[in-house]
Amino acid sequence: MFLQNAWYAVAWCDEVTDGIVTRKVLGRELALFRDGEGQPRAILNRCPHRFAPLSLGKRIGDAIQCPYHGLHFGPDGRCVHNPHGDGVVPDVATPTFPARERHKLIWAWMGDPALATDDIAGGEYGYLDDVELDLLPRGHLHLDCDYRLVIDNLMDPAHVAVLHDSALASEALIRAVPRVWREEDVIRVESWAPDSKPSFLFGAWLGNHDDPVDHWVASRWQAAGLLSVEGGVVAVGGDREDGLRVRGAHMITPETETSAHYFWAVVRNFREDDAEQSEQIRATTAAIFTGEDKWMLEAIERSMDGEEFWSLRPAILGTDRAAVMVRRALESEIKAEGRPKVVAVSAG
């Protein structure tokens, strides 16, 4: 089940330069490239003549030359040159998808182009714009699991205490009762642990593992797979804005029904210009996501063995409320998208 009319992250901006990048999104393989003005373009990676992957071809000016028979396709997907015979250009095109460059990422809109919005996630990822690209801890992870399992994971503060016990766990956060609420099309969950010891990573960043702090973790979801997760600590009784904070952007893009792309980046409000600190955060985050989250989510996918999530009748804990709300909201949006539109006709 995929939401078509939504923006999906498909590449980091510096991945798409002079060549052609391929990425499968919602079961369709895209060819990503930049036109002569440097704007990102996304077309179906399939020549409409004999179905050769266009990504195996060459860039010639604004066009891509098919590697099989040499037809040229422009940024709008239309054939613009036929090298054979009388040179008559066939009236054919490969499908195109709206593409944007925002917040250091390339995004593609997989649904109706007329419905593509100008903004992405309501500008939520604007905090990525304030960090130089070479100082931004970031990555792209491929997972062999349903994309909704990844979203469940990010909206579930309870798993941190067990799966990430060595780096992120906090005894007080384990006992905290998450607050869950909805603001229009955004669902949020937050856990608050006052007067408690920091997790290992926050203790390391503070340089103090023993003194109590007020600790929090908060997640935000917006369709289809756009999430932010913030963790922070502040002196007991202090203002959260004065605390030490780390904020993660998590963009989940379905590849197929059982695989996904996970784009992530982390910003912080301490030692922001320290390249060594950035690399330490990148390496630590990548190790956690790869060695713990990816490992677990792919194991869950295998364990489910192709069964539909709700058909397995999962036990629901109190800490699952946010993840369940998101699943229901996403299911509702997908169903609404598939319904025929009702057009009112006035009586004549």
Curated annotation (Swiss-Prot):
GO terms assigned for molecular function: 2 iron, 2 sulfur cluster binding; metal ion binding; oxidoreductase activity
SUPFAM superfamilies, A to Z = Bet v1-like, ISP domain
pH-related activity info reads: Optimum pH is 7.
What domain of life does the UniProt record list for this protein's source? Bacteria
Q: Which residues bind [2Fe-2S] cluster?
A: 47, 49, 66, 69
Q: GO biological process annotations for this chain's record?
A: catabolic process
Reactions that this protein is recorded to catalyse: butachlor + 2 reduced [2Fe-2S]-[ferredoxin] + O2 + 2 H(+) = butyl formate + N-(2,6-diethylphenyl)-2-chloroacetamide + 2 oxidized [2Fe-2S]-[ferredoxin] + H2O; alachlor + 2 reduced [2Fe-2S]-[ferredoxin] + O2 + 2 H(+) = methyl formate + N-(2,6-diethylphenyl)-2-chloroacetamide + 2 oxidized [2Fe-2S]-[ferredoxin] + H2O; acetochlor + 2 reduced [2Fe-2S]-[ferredoxin] + O2 + 2 H(+) = N-(2-ethyl-6-methylphenyl)-2-chloroacetamide + ethyl formate + 2 oxidized [2Fe-2S]-[ferredoxin] + H2O
Q: Using the record's annotation, list all stretches that form the Rieske domain.
A: 7-108
Keyword Zinc-finger recorded? no
Cofactor, how bound (note):
Binds 1 [2Fe-2S] cluster per subunit.
Q: How is its activity regulated?
A: Activity enhanced by Fe(2+) and Mg(2+) ions. Divalent cations such as Ca(2+), Cr(2+), Co(2+), and Mn(2+) show moderate inhibition of the enzyme, whereas heavy metal ions such as Ag(+), Cu(2+), Pb(2+), Hg(2+), Ni(2+) and Zn(2+) severely inhibit the activity.
Provide the cofactor list for this protein.
Answer: [2Fe-2S] cluster
Could you tell me which InterPro entries the record lists for this protein? Cholesterol_7-desaturase, Rieske_2Fe-2S, Rieske_2Fe-2S_sf, VanA_C_cat
* Keywords, ordered alphabetically: 2Fe-2S, Aromatic hydrocarbons catabolism, Iron, Iron-sulfur, Metal-binding, Oxidoreductase, Plasmid
Q: Temperature annotation for this entry?
A: Optimum temperature is 35 degrees Celsius.
Mind telling me which residues the site (Plays a role in the stabilization the metal coordination) is annotated on? 153
Q: Determine if Aminoacyl-tRNA synthetase is one of this entry's keywords.
A: no
Q: What biological function has been recorded for the protein in this entry? A: Component of the chloroacetanilide N-alkylformylase multicomponent enzyme system involved in the degradation of chloroacetanilide herbicides (N-alkoxyalkyl-N-chloroacetyl-substituted aniline derivatives). In vitro, catalyzes the N-dealkylation of butachlor, alachlor and acetochlor to yield 2-chloro-N-(2,6-diethylphenyl)acetamide (CDEPA) (for alachlor and butachlor) and 2-chloro-N-(2-methyl-6-ethylphenyl)acetamide (CMEPA) (for acetochlor).
Question: What is the official name of this protein in its record?
Answer: Chloroacetanilide N-alkylformylase, oxygenase component
